[in-house]
Every structure is written in C-alpha cells, then in structure tokens.
Amino acid sequence: MSDGKKKLSFLTVISTIICVVFVCEAAAPAAAIGNQQFFWWIFLILTFLLPYGMVVAELGTTYDGEGGIYDWVRDGLGDKWGARISYYYWVNYPLWIASLATMFPDILGMVFGVEFNLIAKIGIDLAFVWIVYLMGRSKAADSEWVLNGGAIIKVAVAVIVGALGIWYAMENGFANDMSAATFLPELTNTNALGYLSIIIFNFMGFEVICTMTDDMADPARDIPKAIIVGGLSIAVIYLFAGFGIGAAVSADSIDPDYGMIYAVQTIVGDSMIFKVICIAFLITLFANMAAWSFGVNSVARYAAEHGNMPKVFTSMISDDDMPNGANLVNAIVASLVLCLQLVPIDAISNGVFWMLFGTSIVFLLLTYIPMFPAFLNLRKNDPNRERIFTFPFKGAMMKVMLAIPCIELILAIVATLIPFSVDEIGDKVPMIVIFIVLLLIGEVVRVVSAKGRETECKGLTPELAAQRLAEESEED
C-alpha cells in the first residue's frame, strides 16, 4: 500500500537498529568486566538476545501499531502494566540524555586543551539537551541522514578503536593477562558483575523500529530480517571494540565514563587521530538520542491517549504528526536533572554520568520484564491472528526460553543497584535513592493519569481478540 509518504528503505531500517541499539558510550563499562566479557557476551547473545529478538519480531509483525512495546503490554496485561512500562520507558530517556550531556564538556576539553568551570559545563550540557530536542522534532522518514550517518560513524569509531587496540597490543603487548582462565566468568567479582547490565542494555532497542511501521515500505518483511542482521552485526561490533579497549587498557583501569576515549588516548596520545575520534564520538551521541526520541515519544503519546500518561504528552502535535509536547517534556526534565551537578556531594557531583546512566539502564531493563508474560497472554488469548513470524518454541520449552531473559533482567537490575561491597556504597546509594523516588513518582503519575479514563483495559480476552479481528477484516 502506498500513501504517497516517503518510506524508510531496508538499509535505513538496518541503520536505525544500529543507530538505536549500538551505543559507543556503553562499550567501555562492558570492557571493564575484563576478558570474561567475551564469555558473557556470547552467553547473553544465546540466552537473552535471541529470545528477546524473536519475541520482538513476532509482536512487531503481528501488532503493527505505533505504540510498540506499550501496545503489546497493554493488550497482554492491561492498562495498569501498560501505564507502568510507558513511564519506565519514558523516564529512562531524559536520564540518558542528561548522562550523555555530562560527557560533552570533558571530551571537548580533551580536544581543545581547555578545562571548563562548573557553570560553563552546565551550559554545554544544556546546549546538548536542547539540540537533541530540536532534532527530535523531525519525523524518522525525513531524518534518514541522521539514522544512516549516525550508524556509519558509530561503526567507524568502533572499528577504528578495535583496530588501534590490536595494533597497540602487537607493538607493546596486551594490557591484560590473556591466559585462558581470564576468559571464564568470575562470579565472586561483584564489581565486574555490576556492569553486566551494560551488556543486556546493549541489546535493547529493537522494538523502536516497530514504532516506525507506518514509515516502512514492508514492515512484515523488514522487521524480522533487520533484527537478525542488525543483532548479529551489533554483537560483532561490540566484541571488536571491547577487545580493542581491553588490549590497550587494563580492566581495573578502564573508566566507565570515558573508557573508550582514554583507550584511544593511551594508544595514539593527543594526536589529530585522537581529536577526530573524540569529535566523531560526540556526533554519535546526538544521532543516538535522535533515533531513540522517535520511539520514546511515540510510546509516551500513545499511552497518554489511553489515559496512561499525562495529557501533556499528546500536546503540540506538529503538522507531520510529531508529538512535540513529549519532546519538550524530555528536554525540560533532562535540564532539571543536570542541576544535580550543583549538589555539593562528591559521589553525586563527580559521579554524575554513571549515576544517571546506571539509573537510566535500570528503568529501561525494568520496562522489558512485563513484555514476556504479555507475549504469553497474547499467544493464549489471540490465537487466531495471523503471525507472519512466529517464536520458534512451543509449550514448556517456550516458557523456559521466555523465563530465562526475565530472570537475567531482574539479576542485572539487582547487580546494578545493590552494593555488594563497602567500596560500592558511595556510588550506588545515590542511584538507589533516585530510582526509588522516580519509581514512586511513576505510581503517582499512573494513578493521576487514569482519572481521565472512562474505562480500564484489563488486557485482551479471547472474546475481545475475536471482536477486534472481525472489525479489522471489515475495514479491509
């Protein structure tokens, strides 16, 4: 069907996945796990990425609304959980924007050899936030240059970092012990396990392309293929970049904030290559936030239309149907969060990147847990709907394959938030406080938003599913 609108090509769909899912800033915390990161990457590809990707492929090709994961959870579990995950999905985004904004002043300082004071830093942070806001006002199909360009630059940065790391190791030897034993998981290393959530986080985002179905030429064909091709490509890119970082910098010295940048600086010094990679890295941050804004804003808007998020998220709809109200709220919240840098507590003001980024990750991971039981309910209550792509397991095996990623998500959240040693208390307590406060705010938002709702959806029943199918067939 052609409606005369510009459509996303399959190449752009792949680029969108890479632009959304692959985030350069997450490579360093994963590399901080040490050589055992390779075990965990392979293990989580098999036990998390594959079942998660196949669930998203089935849901995305079966239910093609622009609400994405929100629609799936609402249909599977009802308004209560639909409201919760829409809030979790949304609140992760301004936290993420704010965390990335804090990287800009320091990296610019490395490039130009200057050191910014706190006021100048916050000014640069805010400039990043509001440029992202302006980029988020453009529809996905009209921003192919952002998606394609962002993907190309991200891959280029990762490949260059990996190649430089290998070259450095060949010239100077590996910075880490490369014996076989170091590649096995060390379950007693609680500090390293705290970064496992980063690897799972690095797989998140495939569902964002499912909110762009109206912009795709053939979503039923493109979504499953893009998830498979994009997922495998991203895993290879991460492993290569992580190897490069680990080759040049010892695991216990990798900075979770600027690890990739410091690795390049260790290899090539303050050369022009270093400066170019720094600038390219900063450009990828803009591309990443722009790509995510399309999905996050659509979910927030859809939820608000059902009385599951505040009405402000349905305001300021542009001529090309962009929810600019949601976009504006993102920028305002991110700007306010950045003021935490003014708090005169060292663990907060100096550890702001990981505090915000880690909390963002927790909320994003929390979003996906209800998706798996919702998937089971939709399979049970909507069995007659045509499924172009089908999750390949059935019965008890299917339940096991869905339970494993749920358990991994819960464990990753616990490992990120809970301090398992005295040394972690100072860094993790602020994260716990922010998480609890935002979680409680989310419950208030859910209850208040529901007051304007005339009826409550309890999730699809077999009768409602049959009725919906009949209505859709009449429309066709």
Language-model regions, residue ranges each:
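Membrane-helix boundary/coupling elements in multi-pass transport proteins
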Residues: 88-102, 203, 208-215, 271-311, ...
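Loop-to-transmembrane helix boundary motifs in multi-pass membrane proteins
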Residues: 2-11, 124-126, 217-221, 225, ...
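Hydrophobic transmembrane alpha-helices that form the core helical bundles
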Residues: 31-32, 51-129, 134-137, 282-299, ...
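Helix-loop-helix junctions that connect adjacent transmembrane segments
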Residues: 36-39, 120, 148-278
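Membrane-interface "cap" regions at the ends of multi-pass membrane proteins
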Residues: 1-43, 49-57, 63-66, 180, ...
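TM-loop-TM module centered on a large, flexible mid-protein loop between adjacent transmembrane helices
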Residues: 71-72, 78, 110-114, 228-290, ...
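Terminal cytosolic tails of multi-pass membrane transporters
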Residues: 1-7, 372-400, 419-476
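Membrane-interface loop-to-helix entry segments
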Residues: 119-174, 187, 204, 227-232, ...
